[in-house]
């Protein structure tokens, strides 16, 4: 049996065959393509293999029968990692068998496009994950920016505004709504800005008092704030302690602030009384002297004109009546004088 017959028989059976020395000589006679030098594990270990591999030619080599180290492949190029086996086969002695990956199931070569396909999928998955993470980060950043409170523009006070605010703060640390509105008209500031300024000024004052160590003043300050907020009157004990003076009282600062507030209210009441008296006097003047227009207010001008007209009408009617009565008296006197003359 020749080497070609062995190759055809091995291809039909699908088994690995190891050629003998005689077959090697006949293969040399037929050409370099029939040279069979194998390096099977069984031959390397010195064992006789029942199944012998055939030699497979490579189509990419020079000529149809050219082999690498005595072994050629027909199914294409060598798979990755088996190049050193071909180099090792050239150093093996003749008669050794060849272990080929095409006939062993666990050494089957995988196509390159499979690796490329899996790598592309992996890259796509990674890019998708990165895009999802990037979108999440963008959403978190946008939500954080929306939740972040925008800082209001800081109000810059002028010297005139600060002077007015300090004056009102020295008068009362807790101004009511009416006082804040009046101060807003003077300083041309919003009422809420004035309220915030007073809050900050009170905090600054408390901090300064704490640094000085005046704890009693801080206690009085807290009591005064509670009194103003809840409309609580000043206790009688504190008022009675101020009979000998503010210095000997138990709460001098609180009594001083109370005195200021009382003075302000009394001043307002006095102003109201003065205005009421002036109004009463002007009305009396209008009734007594209807022709005088110097003391008339523009608010009651029309009313005073009506009153003066009515009084003028009344005066004219009374004058007529007086004239009539005087004429009657004169006529009676004349008649009496005539009667006396006739008697004589």
Swiss-Prot record:
Name listed for the protein in its UniProt record: Visual system homeobox 1
UniProt keyword annotations, A-Z: Developmental protein, Differentiation, DNA-binding, Homeobox, Nucleus, Transcription, Transcription regulation
Subcellular location: Nucleus
Motif (Nuclear localization signal): 146-150
GO CC annotations on file: nucleus
GO BP annotation list: regulation of transcription by RNA polymerase II; retinal bipolar neuron differentiation
Function: Involved in the differentiation of bipolar cells, the last neurons of the retina to form. Together with other retinal homeobox proteins, acts as an effector of a cellular clock which, depending on cell cycle progression, establishes the generation of distinct retinal neuronal cell types.
Tissue distribution: Initially transcribed but not translated in early neural (stage 15) retinal progenitors. Translation occurs during late retinogenesis and requires cell cycle progression with the timing of translation paralleling that of the generation of bipolar cells. Also expressed in the ciliary marginal zone (CMZ) with translation beginning in early postmitotic cells. Also transcribed in early neurulae in the presumptive spinal cord, with expression expanding anteriorly to the midbrain-hindbrain boundary during the tail bud stage.
InterPro entries according to UniProt: CVC, HD, Homeobox_CS, Homeodomain-like_sf, VSX_homeobox_regulators
Biased composition (Basic and acidic residues): 1-12, 111-126, 273-284, 303-313, 331-344
Biased composition (Polar residues): 315-330
Renumbered residue ranges of the record's region Disordered: 1-33, 111-154, 273-344
Main location: nucleus
Gene designation per UniProt: vsx1
Superkingdom per UniProt: Eukaryota
GO molecular function, one term: DNA-binding transcription factor activity, RNA polymerase II-specific
Regions recorded as binding DNA: 150-209
């Amino acid at each position: 049996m020749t080497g070609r017959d062995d190759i055809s028989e091995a291809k039909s059976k699908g088994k690995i065959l190891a050629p003998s020395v005689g077959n090697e000589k006949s293969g040399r006679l037929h050409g370099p393509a029939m040279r069979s030098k194998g390096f099977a594990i069984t031959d390397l270990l010195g064992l006789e293999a029942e199944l012998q591999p055939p030699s497979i030619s490579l189509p990419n080599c020079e000529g149809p029968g050219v082999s690498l180290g005595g072994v050629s492949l027909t199914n294409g190029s060598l798979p990755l990692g088996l190049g050193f086996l071909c180099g090792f086969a050239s150093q093996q002695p003749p008669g050794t068998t060849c272990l080929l990956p095409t006939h062993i199931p666990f050494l089957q070569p995988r196509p390159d496009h499979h690796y490329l396909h899996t790598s592309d999928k992996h890259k796509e998955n990674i890019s998708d994950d990165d895009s999802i993470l990037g979108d999440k980060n963008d959403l978190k950043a946008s939500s954080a920016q929306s939740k972040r409170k925008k800082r209001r523009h800081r109000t810059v006070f002028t010297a005139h505004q600060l002077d007015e605010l300090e004056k009102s703060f020295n008068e009362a640390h807790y101004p009511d709504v009416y006082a804040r509105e009046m101060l807003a008209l003077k300083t041309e500031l919003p009422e809420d800005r004035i309220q915030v300024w007073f809050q900050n000024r009170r905090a600054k004052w408390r901090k300064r008092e704490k640094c000085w160590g005046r704890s009693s003043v801080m206690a009085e300050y807290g009591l005064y704030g509670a009194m103003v907020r809840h409309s609580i009157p000043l206790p009688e004990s504190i008022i009675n302690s101020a009979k000998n003076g503010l210095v000997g009282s138990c709460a001098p600062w609180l009594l001083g602030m109370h005195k200021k507030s009382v003075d302000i209210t009394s001043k307002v009441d006095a102003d109201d009384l003065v205005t009421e008296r002036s109004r009463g006097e002007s009305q009396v003047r209008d009734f007594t002297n209807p022709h005088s227009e110097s003391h008339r207010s523009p608010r009651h001008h029309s009313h005073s004109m009506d009153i003066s007209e009515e009084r003028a009408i009344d005066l004219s009617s009374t004058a007529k009546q007086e004239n009539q009565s005087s004429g009657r008296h004169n006529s009676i006197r004349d008649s009496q004088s005539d009667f006396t003359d006739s008697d004589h």
